[in-house]
Swiss-Prot record:
Record note on quaternary structure: Homodimer.
Catalytic activity: IMP + L-aspartate + GTP = N(6)-(1,2-dicarboxyethyl)-AMP + GDP + phosphate + 2 H(+)
Annotated keywords: Cytoplasm, GTP-binding, Ligase, Magnesium, Metal-binding, Nucleotide-binding, Purine biosynthesis
Annotated Pfam families: Adenylsucc_synt
Organism: Drosophila erecta
Record GO cellular component, one term: cytoplasm
Family stated for the protein in its record: Belongs to the adenylosuccinate synthetase family.
Protein name, entry field: Adenylosuccinate synthetase
């Protein structure tokens, strides 16, 4: 008898005798739409029970709002978990960091009562830096596009990731090393950008003096976060990752080119923190009870009417980072099925259900159709195709009563429960929480 017959096939052997390297898993919170779903509130809710909260990608183009003990905190680079003084917050290697903005954010939130950050914030030495000239270039590139702009935040995120991809970016660790080498690299990257964009003006010596000071300020926070996280997992520490932006803004899977410059899906968690796939535990998709989008780009369920105005007003849909009004529309099931395929949600948190309280009926997109009437079995891969689809809606009854004070799922109006169950059924993913207000106490546990 052959060895393979005795011990199984090679594939079966591959899965035998696995050793468990890690004592804990990494749970992930991801935006399931175009951002602004309420990820920060979900992270804040879960962070009270975890040891470490991480940001893995993006920069200060993200905006998360957390209400804790009646105080509203706005975060752009800091993980929302910093509100919990018992956990460590990590800014991973996949994040791009504008140091002036980071320290401004720290000061503003310290003024609101945030304390002892120096003991519980860790920044990756491999994270890339965003410089002021990146921001200037971002604004210039948007202006050059005229009416075809992408609607970026002009925070320099795209140009910084571009520097990273072309291998002339500068990482935090280089700022803390030999400053002469940092100075040479900085002069080189400035020269490259001035050559490409002659109108930008950079006072190199003034910037170097400024960054010499920033080196001293940031030094106490910087570590090898990859080693830190793997050690934590081996020791059974609980880790939560806060995704920035959202799946439909992902550079690969979003509505390209109307996207951000990083991977905001599950893959970005792994590359942005240096984690292998087997460390991932729960993947929580955060879904707003309707759909919003900031900036330009296709939006199949957008409502340019009284419904859109009502959602914008009741939901106070204004961007935390951009201060722009968000575009509003109905919940989009085909979009959510697509992002669930990409991210593999194990459960969902529905937020802002209370914003729908006044509506007599609520529409939900259930299918996309070609102009011929044929239903699409996939999410369109180009904006041209997405802009040419027709949307098929299901019409569900509203509940026309306030849900803001409800704290038990079974006490929600029957039609509100049905709305949540409809979403759950369509996606075949359990809804674990429902949000009906701003504070952490307004999140209802469904199961």
């Amino acid at each position: 008898m052959s060895a393979s017959a005795t011990n199984g096939t090679h594939y079966e052997q591959l899965h035998q005798g696995r050793t468990k390297m890690y004592k804990s898993k990494v749970d992930v919170v991801l935006g399931a739409q175009w951002g602004d779903e309420g990820k920060g509130k979900v992270v804040d809710m879960l962070a009270s029970d975890v040891d470490i909260v991480c940001r893995c990608q993006g920069g200060n183009n993200a905006g998360h709002t957390v209400v804790a003990n009646g105080t509203e905190f706005d975060f752009h680079l800091l993980p929302s978990g910093v509100v919990n003084e018992k956990c460590v917050s990590v800014i991973g290697n996949g994040v791009v960091i504008h140091l002036p903005s980071l320290f401004d954010e720290v000061l503003k939130n310290e003024a609101k009562g945030l304390q002892h950050l120096e003991n519980r914030l860790i920044i990756s030495d491999r994270a890339h830096l965003v410089f002021d000239f990146h921001q200037h270039v971002d604004g210039m590139q948007e202006a050059e596009k005229g009416g075809k702009s992408l609607g970026t935040t002009k925070k320099g995120i795209g140009p910084a990731y571009s520097s990273k991809a072309t291998r002339n970016g500068i990482r935090v660790g280089e700022l803390l090393g030999d400053f002469n080498l940092f100075s040479e690299k900085f002069k080189s990257i400035v020269a490259t950008h001035v050559r490409l964009f002659p109108s930008i003006n950079v006072d190199v010596e003034a910037e170097l003096a400024r960054y010499k000071d920033y080196a001293d300020k940031v030094r106490p926070y910087v570590k090898d976060t990859i080693c830190f996280l793997h050690t934590a997992l081996r020791n059974g520490k609980t880790i939560l990752v806060e995704g920035a932006n959202a799946a439909m803004l992902d550079i690969d899977f979003g509505t390209y080119p109307y996207v951000t410059s990083s991977n905001c899906s599950i893959g970005g968690v792994l590359t942005g923190l240096g984690l292998p796939p087997q460390t991932i535990g729960e993947v929580i998709g955060v879904v707003k009870a309707y759909t919003t989008r900031v900036g330009d780009g296709p939006f199949p369920t957008e409502q340019l009417n009284d419904i859109g105005d009502l959602l914008q007003t009741r939901g106070f849909e204004i961007g935390v980072t951009t201060k722009r009004k968000r575009r509003c529309g109905w919940l989009d099931i085909p979009l959510l099925k697509y992002t669930s395929l990409v991210n593999g949600y194990t459960c969902i948190c529905v937020t802002k259900l209370d914003i729908l309280d006044t509506l007599p009926e609520i529409k939900v997109a259930v299918a996309y159709k070609k102009p011929s009437g044929e239903k699409l079995d996939h999410f369109p891969g180009t904006i041209a195709e997405l802009g040419n689809i027709e949307v098929e809606y299901a019409v569900l009854p509203g509940w026309q009563t306030s849900t803001e004070d409800v704290r038990n799922f079974k006490e929600l109006p029957e039609n509100a429960q049905s709305y949540v169950r409809f979403l759950e059924s369509e996606l075949s993913v359990p809804v674990r929480w429902v949000g009906v207000g701003k504070g952490r106490e307004s999140i209802i546990n469904v199961h």
